């Protein structure tokens, strides 16, 4: 079995004990299996990502003595070649490759109809995708599993970015 794993911290704060435990378990498992380990920094939320948090990721991994096979080697390499926040156009090209539908429901509207989950309201409405006015939902077997891949704010959703990055 070929093992591929990733460390995927979010630079919205300094790393914490949960990150360190996850990194340790992932690193040990991947190295014991002779697998490939990637570093993917999830900076999609550009408003909360800060340079000092990105630097902390590299400093902590170096301090722990962890290596990785793929991904950025430094904060500068990350900003120049790997930043998700700078790759919106790439994600835009991917979004409609997945079976789905446009949806203009707000969270408030969904909550008013059903407090538990998305009810599939837009599945058959035939809305046209307008990346700045509608979201793109992945069509799945059950409406509550129709996750958002593109947000109304004309930005990729975390699920889409994670999927594209892991391909």
Show the residue positions of the predicted features.
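Active-site cores that bind ATP or allylic diphosphates and position pyrophosphate for catalysis
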Residues: 105-167
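N-terminal Rossmann-like or analogous alpha/beta NTP/dinucleotide-binding catalytic cores
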Residues: 1-119, 126
């Amino acid at each position: 079995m070929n093992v591929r794993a990733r460390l995927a911290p979010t630079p919205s704060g300094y790393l914490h004990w949960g990150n360190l435990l996850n990194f340790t378990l992932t690193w040990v498992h991947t190295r014991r299996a002779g697998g490939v380990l990637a570093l993917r920094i999830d900076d999609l939320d550009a408003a909360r990502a800060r340079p000092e948090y990105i630097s902390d990721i590299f400093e902590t991994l170096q301090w722990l003595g962890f290596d990785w096979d793929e991904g950025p080697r430094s904060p500068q390499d990350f900003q120049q070649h790997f930043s998700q926040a700078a790759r919106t156009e790439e994600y835009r090209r991917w979004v409609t490759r997945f079976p789905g539908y446009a949806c203009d429901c707000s969270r408030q509207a969904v909550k008013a109809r059903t407090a538990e989950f998305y009810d599939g309201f837009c599945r058959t409405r035939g809305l046209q995708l307008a990346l700045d006015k509608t979201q793109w939902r992945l069509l799945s077997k059950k409406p509550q599993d129709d996750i958002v891949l593109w947000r109304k704010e004309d930005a990729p959703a975390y699920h889409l970015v994670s999927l594209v990055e892991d391909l």
